C-alpha cells in the first residue's frame, strides 16, 4: 500500500460523504411523515446507513478496482450475480431520473409561472426535454468537469439546505404559527402498514455511501479515522435531512404539500413572511444550477458499470461499443427510451404526487435489492476469501460482520414489503394501476438481466 497517496483527513471524508448523500429532493417526501420523520431517520441510520458505510468501506479497500458493487458481488457469487446487480444499479437510476428532473422542472416553474409546478404536462415535457438534451450532449462527449459538478452540488444542495434549516429555526424561535394538521407525535403510527410505506423513500434518500467508500483507503489511518468520519458523516447527514424536512413540516400543511414542489413552496412561505419574496427566485436558481450541473453526471455515470459488464459478454455486443468520443451510445439511447416510457406515469396516474411516489418507490425497491446483494457478498467474502488484503476491516471478526450485514438485509426486506402498500400520506385513487406498475416493473426489470445472464452462461458452456 502506497502511503504517499493517503491524503484524506477526517474532515475531507466527511465532506465527500455529505456531498454524495445529502439531497434536497428527499426533503418534501420526508416531510409527509410529519414529526415522526426524526424517528425514521434515526432508525434508518442505525439499521441501514451505518451498516452500508461500514460494509462498503471494507469491500472497497479489499477490491479497489473500478466497478464497485459489481466487482464485489461478482467475486462473491460469480459473473451472473454481478451482472444482475450492476443492471439493477443502472435501471433504478433510470427509473429515478424522472423524479429528479420533475423536481428541477417544478423548481424552474417558480421563475416562469408558479402554477405550472402542479401541471403534469409541463413537468413531463420539461423533464423529457432536459433529459434528451443532456443525453445527446453525452453522446458527443460533452461533459462538465468534476470540479464544476462538485461546486454545483455545493451551491445547489448544501447552501439551500442550510438556508431552509436556518429559516425553520428562526421561525420557531420567533414563535410564528406552525402547521397543525401533522401528527404531533414523534413516533410513527403503527396501527396501519400504510403509515410506514414511506420508509423505503427514507432509505432511498440515504443511498450513496458505497460510492464514497472507495476513498476509505486514502484515509491516513483507516482503522481509526474511517469510523470517526462515518460517525460525523451520519450525524451531519441525518441532522441536515431531518431538520430540512422539519422546516417544511412547520410551514406547509400536509394536505397541500406536494412531494415535487413542496421545497420551493416552503421557501416561498418563509420569504413572503419576511417580505423577501425575491429570495425564493434566488434559491430556485441555485437549486436549478445545482441540479443541472449533476444531470450530465447522472446520465453517463451508471452506464459505465453496465459497459464493463457488457464487455464481459453479459449483454449483446451492440452495448459494448463506444463511439469516437468514448460514449456508449447504444446504452444511452436505450436509457432514454426507457426514461421516456416511464415518464408517462405522470399522465397515467391521477395526481403528480402519486406518479412521483410510484417512480420513487420502484427505484427504492430495486436499489434495496442491490444493497441486499452487497450485504450478502460481504458475508460470503469473509468466509470464502479471508486472505484478501483489506485496508479497512470491520472489527469483531466474522460474527460482527454477519450481524451488521444481517441487520442491513432485514431492514431492506422490511422496507421492500411495506413499499408495496400505498402510503397513507399520499392518496392514490387507482391502487390497481399503482400495484401493476410497481410489481410489473420490478418483475420486468429483474427478469431481463436474469435472461441475459442465463443466455451468456449457456454460450460460455457451449464454447467450452
From Swiss-Prot:
<keyword id="KW-1133">Transmembrane helix</keyword>
<feature type="transmembrane region" description="Helical">
    <location>
        <begin position="94"/>
        <end position="114"/>
    </location>
</feature>
<feature type="transmembrane region" description="Helical">
    <location>
        <begin position="231"/>
        <end position="251"/>
    </location>
</feature>
<comment type="similarity">
    <text>Belongs to the amino acid-polyamine-organocation (APC) superfamily.</text>
</comment>
<keyword id="KW-1003">Cell membrane</keyword>
<feature type="transmembrane region" description="Helical">
    <location>
        <begin position="196"/>
        <end position="216"/>
    </location>
</feature>
<protein>
    <recommendedName>
        <fullName>Uncharacterized transporter lpg1691</fullName>
    </recommendedName>
</protein>
<feature type="transmembrane region" description="Helical">
    <location>
        <begin position="329"/>
        <end position="349"/>
    </location>
</feature>
<dbReference type="InterPro" id="IPR050367">
    <property type="entry name" value="APC_superfamily"/>
</dbReference>
<feature type="transmembrane region" description="Helical">
    <location>
        <begin position="432"/>
        <end position="452"/>
    </location>
</feature>
<keyword id="KW-0472">Membrane</keyword>
<feature type="transmembrane region" description="Helical">
    <location>
        <begin position="153"/>
        <end position="173"/>
    </location>
</feature>
<feature type="transmembrane region" description="Helical">
    <location>
        <begin position="282"/>
        <end position="302"/>
    </location>
</feature>
<keyword id="KW-0813">Transport</keyword>
<dbReference type="GO" id="GO:0022857">
    <property type="term" value="F:transmembrane transporter activity"/>
</dbReference>
<keyword id="KW-0812">Transmembrane</keyword>
<feature type="transmembrane region" description="Helical">
    <location>
        <begin position="359"/>
        <end position="379"/>
    </location>
</feature>
<dbReference type="Pfam" id="PF13520">
    <property type="entry name" value="AA_permease_2"/>
</dbReference>
<feature type="transmembrane region" description="Helical">
    <location>
        <begin position="37"/>
        <end position="57"/>
    </location>
</feature>
<dbReference type="InterPro" id="IPR002293">
    <property type="entry name" value="AA/rel_permease1"/>
</dbReference>
<feature type="transmembrane region" description="Helical">
    <location>
        <begin position="121"/>
        <end position="141"/>
    </location>
</feature>
<feature type="transmembrane region" description="Helical">
    <location>
        <begin position="7"/>
        <end position="27"/>
    </location>
</feature>
<dbReference type="GO" id="GO:0005886">
    <property type="term" value="C:plasma membrane"/>
</dbReference>
<feature type="transmembrane region" description="Helical">
    <location>
        <begin position="401"/>
        <end position="421"/>
    </location>
</feature>
Amino acid at each position: 500500500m502506497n502511503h504517499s497517496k493517503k491524503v484524506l483527513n477526517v474532515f475531507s471524508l466527511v465532506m465527500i460523504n455529505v456531498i454524495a448523500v445529502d439531497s434536497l429532493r428527499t426533503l418534501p417526501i420526508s416531510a409527509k411523515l410529519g414529526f415522526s420523520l426524526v424517528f425514521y431517520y434515526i432508525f434508518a441510520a442505525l439499521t441501514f446507513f451505518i451498516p452500508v458505510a461500514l460494509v462498503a468501506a471494507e469491500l472497497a479497500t479489499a477490491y479497489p478496482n473500478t466497478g464497485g458493487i459489481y466487482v464485489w458481488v461478482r467475486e462473491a457469487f460469480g459473473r451472473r450475480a454481478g451482472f444482475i446487480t450492476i443492471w439493477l444499479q443502472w435501471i433504478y437510476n433510470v427509473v429515478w431520473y424522472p423524479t429528479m428532473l420533475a423536481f428541477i422542472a417544478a423548481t424552474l416553474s417558480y421563475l416562469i409561472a408558479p402554477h405550472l409546478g402542479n401541471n403534469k404536462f409541463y413537468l413531463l415535457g420539461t423533464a423529457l426535454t432536459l433529459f434528451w438534451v443532456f443525453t445527446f450532449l453525452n453522446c458527443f462527449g460533452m461533459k462538465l468537469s468534476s470540479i464544476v459538478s462538485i461546486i454545483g452540488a455545493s451551491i445547489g444542495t448544501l447552501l439551500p439546505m442550510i438556508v431552509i434549516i436556518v429559516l425553520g429555526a428562526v421561525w420557531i424561535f420567533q414563535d410564528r404559527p406552525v402547521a397543525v394538521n401533522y401528527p404531533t407525535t414523534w413516533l410513527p403510527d403503527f396501527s396501519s402498514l400504510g403509515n410506514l410505506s414511506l420508509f423505503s423513500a427514507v432509505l432511498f434518500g440515504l443511498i450513496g455511501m458505497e460510492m464514497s467508500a472507495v476513498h476509505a483507503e486514502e484515509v491516513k489511518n483507516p482503522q481509526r479515522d474511517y469510523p470517526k468520519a462515518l460517525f460525523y458523516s451520519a450525524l451531519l447527514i441525518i441532522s441536515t435531512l431531518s431538520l430540512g424536512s422539519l422546516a417544511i413540516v412547520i410551514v406547509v400543511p400536509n394536505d397541500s404539500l406536494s412531494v415535487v414542489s413542496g421545497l420551493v413552496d416552503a421557501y416561498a412561505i418563509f420569504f413572503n413572511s419576511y417580505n423577501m419574496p425575491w429570495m425564493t427566485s434566488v434559491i430556485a436558481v441555485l437549486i436549478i444550477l445545482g441540479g443541472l450541473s449533476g444531470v450530465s453526471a447522472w446520465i453517463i455515470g451508471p452506464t459505465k458499470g453496465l459497459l464493463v459488464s457488457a464487455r464481459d459478454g453479459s449483454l449483446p455486443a451492440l452495448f459494448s461499443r463506444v463511439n469516437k468520443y468514448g460514449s456508449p451510445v447504444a446504452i444511452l439511447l436505450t436509457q432514454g427510451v426507457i426514461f421516456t416510457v416511464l415518464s408517462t406515469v405522470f399522465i397515467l396516474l391521477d395526481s403528480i404526487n402519486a406518479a412521483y411516489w410510484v417512480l420513487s418507490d420502484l427505484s427504492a425497491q430495486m436499489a434495496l435489492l442491490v444493497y441486499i446483494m452487497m450485504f450478502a457478498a460481504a458475508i460470503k467474502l469473509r468466509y470464502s476469501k479471508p486472505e484478501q488484503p483489506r485496508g479497512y476491516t470491520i472489527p469483531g471478526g466474522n460474527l460482527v460482520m454477519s450481524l451488521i450485514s444481517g441487520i442491513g438485509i432485514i431492514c431492506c426486506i422490511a422496507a421492500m414489503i411495506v413499499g408495496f402498500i400505498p402510503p397513507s400520506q399520499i392518496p392514490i385513487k387507482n391502487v390497481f394501476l399503482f400495484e401493476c406498475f410497481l410489481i410489473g416493473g420490478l418483475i420486468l426489470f429483474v427478469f431481463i438481466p436474469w435472461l441475459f445472464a442465463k443466455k451468456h452462461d449457456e454460450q460460455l458452456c457451449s464454447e467450452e
